[in-house]
Amino acid sequence: MMAFRASVLTLYPEMFPGHLGFSLAGKAMERGQWSLDTVQIRDFATDRHRTVDDTPAGGGAGMVLKADVLARAIDSASETDTRPRLLMSPRGRPLTQERVRELAAGDGVIIVCGRFEGVDQRVIEARGLEEVSIGDYVLSGGEPAALTVLDAIVRILPGVMGNDLSGLHESFEGGLLEHPHYTRPQEWEGREIPAILTSGNHGAIEKWRHQEAVRLTRERRPDLLEKAGASPGKSGSNFGKHDA
């Protein structure tokens, strides 16, 4: 199987691989399970000042990343490439675990890191960029968001986690937030590990974990239950049922 290949187009290539050079992702990169290359967008400017932005048409605050410059950068990285092209943008579709799994199942990804006020809409349309958001907030640039997307993808690539079962009960897998975790000591500051977790009854433990996952999801992310067709206010939905 070919290694997952990530290409990032950015004005700040020195920000990569960042934290992805450490821990699971870093070790996976050393083993050749995935690779990362960066493209300096400014290298594709044609004037002597290496200009990559200009004022917004129609007026307004900030600067806009130029279509011609960015298009040349994209073409250099992916002219005959079928990898998905993502543009990190606060107005994009929210990244979901489902989309992460889809991306991880492919050969790789091309990520464009926006800067300034935005990117010329024409290059978004002409180069088929998929606008992706990691949350309802604005960052100073797309680089931290790109690192977040790659982190989410790389950790679920086959063989990256020591135990491929590790991700099965994580938040958003199965449409629920993850259940609470505990470890030794048994008692800490007067707080005990729930007795069910040390009972040795694995069926009861799984049932408890599922019920806790449903409870936390109902409290913190009722939208996830609504998306799956469950009623956030009722415990009698299918999400609340679990065979021991």
From Swiss-Prot:
Keyword tags: Cytoplasm, Methyltransferase, S-adenosyl-L-methionine, Transferase, tRNA processing
Where does the record place the region Disordered? 220-244
The answer, when asked if tRNA processing is one of the entry's keywords, is yes
So which domain of life are we looking at?
Answer: Bacteria
* Catalysed reactions, semicolon-separated: guanosine(37) in tRNA + S-adenosyl-L-methionine = N(1)-methylguanosine(37) in tRNA + S-adenosyl-L-homocysteine + H(+)
Which residues hold S-adenosyl-L-methionine? G114, I134, G135, D136, Y137, V138, L139
Family, according to the entry, reads as follows: Belongs to the RNA methyltransferase TrmD family.
Please give the name of this protein. tRNA (guanine-N(1)-)-methyltransferase
